[in-house]
Amino acid sequence: FIFAAEILGEIQSFYITFPYWDTMLHTLNGFLCAAIGFALVDLLNRNERVSLNLSPFFMAVVAFCFSMTIGVLWEFFEFSMDQIFLMDMQKDTILNTISTVNLDPDHGTKAIIIRGIQDVILVLEDGTQMPLGLGGYLDVGIADTMKDLFVNFIGAVVFSAIGFIYVKTR
């Protein structure tokens, strides 16, 4: 996963060349991490020196939780790299609609919705205006993070279900 993400994705530009590279990696990561979590619990279940006899359902839950924890830790890593080293591991997303309470004129919690965003203009410290010409609002990572966690979830659920069926029928 790290080789595919960092070497192929970042250095060889697979994230740009293949639009769904990131989605595929995070889905696969969810699946594989659930497999690792499941295998670890299964090894403990089968070990005669350890008095552990977990049900297939509980094994599937542990595998799912293991996978999601690894996914969250990876997103923490991406966020840290972006903040500390000014990288762009949490890929930007172009949005045409945003919803924010920061623009509520009453400074309350009413979400103000802005639709049809076509461009963002940056105003630099010296007053220089720089239109980005991106065709929308530049979201700097939250949409990517949530998509990554969602597809990790899908991969984890799929493997956990397979693992449950495997142990239940063995």
Task: Pin down the residues of each PLM region.
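Transmembrane alpha-helical insertion/packing segments
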Residues: 1-39
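Alpha-helical transmembrane segments of multi-pass membrane proteins
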Residues: 2-6, 63, 67-74, 78
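Interfacial helix-loop-helix junctions of multi-pass membrane proteins
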Residues: 11-22, 71-72, 76-159
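Membrane-interfacial alpha-helical segments at the cytosolic side of multi-pass membrane proteins
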Residues: 28-45, 83-89, 154-167
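A structural motif
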Residues: 36-48, 122-130
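Canonical alpha-helical transmembrane segment with a positive-inside/aromatic-interface signature
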Residues: 43-60
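Hydrophobic alpha-helical transmembrane segments
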Residues: 61-64, 150
